[in-house]
Amino acid sequence: MSRHEGVSCDACLKGNFRGRRYKCLICYDYDLCASCYESGATTTRHTTEHPMQCILTRVDFDLYYGGEAFSVEQPQSFTCPYCGKMGYTETSLQEHVTSEHAETSTEVICPICAALPGGDPNHVTDDFAAHLTLEHRAPRDLDESSGVRHVRRMFHPGRGLGGPRARRTNMHFTSSSTGGLSSSQSSSYSPSNREAMDPIAELLSQLSGVRRSAGGQLNSSGPSASQLQQLQMQLQLERQQAQAARQQLETARNATRQRSNPSNISASIPPPSTATNTAMTESNPLASHSSQFLLTRLNEPKMSEAERQALESERADRSLFVQELLLSTLMREESSSSDEDERRDFADFGAMGCVDIMPLDVALESLNLKESSTGKEPPPPPL
């Protein structure tokens, strides 16, 4: 393995990088590549004073050590997470912690669990000495006859340390006692078994990450699917309401049209066939002619023969009276027009200086009237 699979640098964000990997033993899940570590990359939570554990890939270890085999008694490079000193083996690291940092309760990450294949790279504990005693104590008499361990991690010289360390407040840790592998178990594994453990652990971690991401996607897509269903239901209801309103408007319009134009009722109804059309056109005149007298017939009261004869005589008298009245009015108009013509002619004749000849009886009457008027007049008064 020439890459750190599944690991990314928190400074340059390079994933699956090559070369040395430096893991912070104070910050949770914080890794740096060799270039960022040497350049002194820092963040708000990570400083250059934090102790780091150097982790090598298989290819880099073979390149540096040439495939040499180291026994259990020979030194291995682990870093103390409290003081930052390097070059400890599992046994020497435990002795150093119990003697120097027995009363320290700062939460740190176990460098052995982070460096060993198959271990928890982010195992946080606030009792590091007890963790080493329970998980990484290796009795020497239980080792295999070969007594050989293929060291994969190395100590990086030139690592400085200085200044106090602040206690971390936002730290996630597990109190499980099975987080790491014991030295007896790890020492019994051959190099081939250790090499086979790395891809299995990586596959398990990848599968767990895929399951979590899939679960998050399902949870996030659940509400969206329900919201889409609700929107579809609302759209269907709105469409149904709009169709019902349109139907009501159409029926109201048809009713008003039928009331305003009753003759268009037959035109608005579609004809079923041509034969029925011809039959309706033939029967329409008769129906209209008979419908004219329908109301009159219904309104006529039932009368006897004598009543009918009396009614007919009254109607005849009324008609005669109306005829005579019309004739008399016409005759009066003609006579009045002739009298007016005669008067006009007499006025014209008098204007010409002619005297009209009066009849004899008219002249006598006018004379008698004059005599009577002269006889009855009083005598004129004396002068």
Swiss-Prot record:
<feature type="compositionally biased region" description="Polar residues">
    <location>
        <begin position="280"/>
        <end position="289"/>
    </location>
</feature>
<feature type="binding site">
    <location>
        <position position="24"/>
    </location>
    <ligand>
        <name>Zn(2+) 2</name>
    </ligand>
</feature>
<comment type="similarity">
    <text>Belongs to the KCMF1 family.</text>
</comment>
<dbReference type="GO" id="GO:0005770">
    <property type="term" value="C:late endosome"/>
</dbReference>
<dbReference type="GO" id="GO:0045202">
    <property type="term" value="C:synapse"/>
</dbReference>
<feature type="region of interest" description="Disordered">
    <location>
        <begin position="242"/>
        <end position="289"/>
    </location>
</feature>
<feature type="coiled-coil region">
    <location>
        <begin position="224"/>
        <end position="261"/>
    </location>
</feature>
<dbReference type="InterPro" id="IPR043145">
    <property type="entry name" value="Znf_ZZ_sf"/>
</dbReference>
<keyword id="KW-0863">Zinc-finger</keyword>
<dbReference type="GO" id="GO:0016740">
    <property type="term" value="F:transferase activity"/>
</dbReference>
<feature type="binding site">
    <location>
        <position position="46"/>
    </location>
    <ligand>
        <name>Zn(2+) 2</name>
    </ligand>
</feature>
<dbReference type="GO" id="GO:0070534">
    <property type="term" value="P:protein K63-linked ubiquitination"/>
</dbReference>
<feature type="binding site">
    <location>
        <position position="9"/>
    </location>
    <ligand>
        <name>Zn(2+) 1</name>
    </ligand>
</feature>
<keyword id="KW-0479">Metal-binding</keyword>
<keyword id="KW-0862">Zinc</keyword>
<protein>
    <recommendedName>
        <fullName>E3 ubiquitin-protein ligase KCMF1</fullName>
        <ecNumber>2.3.2.27</ecNumber>
    </recommendedName>
</protein>
<keyword id="KW-0808">Transferase</keyword>
<feature type="zinc finger region" description="C2H2-type">
    <location>
        <begin position="78"/>
        <end position="101"/>
    </location>
</feature>
<feature type="binding site">
    <location>
        <position position="33"/>
    </location>
    <ligand>
        <name>Zn(2+) 1</name>
    </ligand>
</feature>
<keyword id="KW-0175">Coiled coil</keyword>
<dbReference type="GO" id="GO:0005764">
    <property type="term" value="C:lysosome"/>
</dbReference>
<dbReference type="InterPro" id="IPR013087">
    <property type="entry name" value="Znf_C2H2_type"/>
</dbReference>
<feature type="binding site">
    <location>
        <position position="12"/>
    </location>
    <ligand>
        <name>Zn(2+) 1</name>
    </ligand>
</feature>
<dbReference type="GO" id="GO:0005886">
    <property type="term" value="C:plasma membrane"/>
</dbReference>
<keyword id="KW-0458">Lysosome</keyword>
<keyword id="KW-0833">Ubl conjugation pathway</keyword>
<dbReference type="GO" id="GO:0008270">
    <property type="term" value="F:zinc ion binding"/>
</dbReference>
<comment type="subunit">
    <text>Component of the SIFI complex, composed of kcmf1, ubr4 and calmodulin.</text>
</comment>
<dbReference type="InterPro" id="IPR050774">
    <property type="entry name" value="KCMF1/Dystrophin"/>
</dbReference>
<dbReference type="InterPro" id="IPR000433">
    <property type="entry name" value="Znf_ZZ"/>
</dbReference>
<feature type="compositionally biased region" description="Low complexity">
    <location>
        <begin position="260"/>
        <end position="279"/>
    </location>
</feature>
<feature type="compositionally biased region" description="Low complexity">
    <location>
        <begin position="175"/>
        <end position="192"/>
    </location>
</feature>
<feature type="region of interest" description="Disordered">
    <location>
        <begin position="141"/>
        <end position="194"/>
    </location>
</feature>
<feature type="zinc finger region" description="ZZ-type">
    <location>
        <begin position="4"/>
        <end position="60"/>
    </location>
</feature>
<feature type="binding site">
    <location>
        <position position="36"/>
    </location>
    <ligand>
        <name>Zn(2+) 1</name>
    </ligand>
</feature>
<dbReference type="Pfam" id="PF00569">
    <property type="entry name" value="ZZ"/>
</dbReference>
<feature type="binding site">
    <location>
        <position position="50"/>
    </location>
    <ligand>
        <name>Zn(2+) 2</name>
    </ligand>
</feature>
<keyword id="KW-0963">Cytoplasm</keyword>
<comment type="function">
    <text>E3 ubiquitin-protein ligase which accepts ubiquitin from an E2 ubiquitin-conjugating enzyme and then transfers it to targeted substrates, promoting their degradation by the proteasome. Together with UBR4, component of the N-end rule pathway: ubiquitinates proteins bearing specific N-terminal residues that are destabilizing according to the N-end rule, leading to their degradation. Does not ubiquitinate proteins that are acetylated at the N-terminus.</text>
</comment>
<feature type="binding site">
    <location>
        <position position="27"/>
    </location>
    <ligand>
        <name>Zn(2+) 2</name>
    </ligand>
</feature>
<dbReference type="GO" id="GO:0099536">
    <property type="term" value="P:synaptic signaling"/>
</dbReference>
<dbReference type="InterPro" id="IPR008598">
    <property type="entry name" value="Di19_Zn-bd"/>
</dbReference>
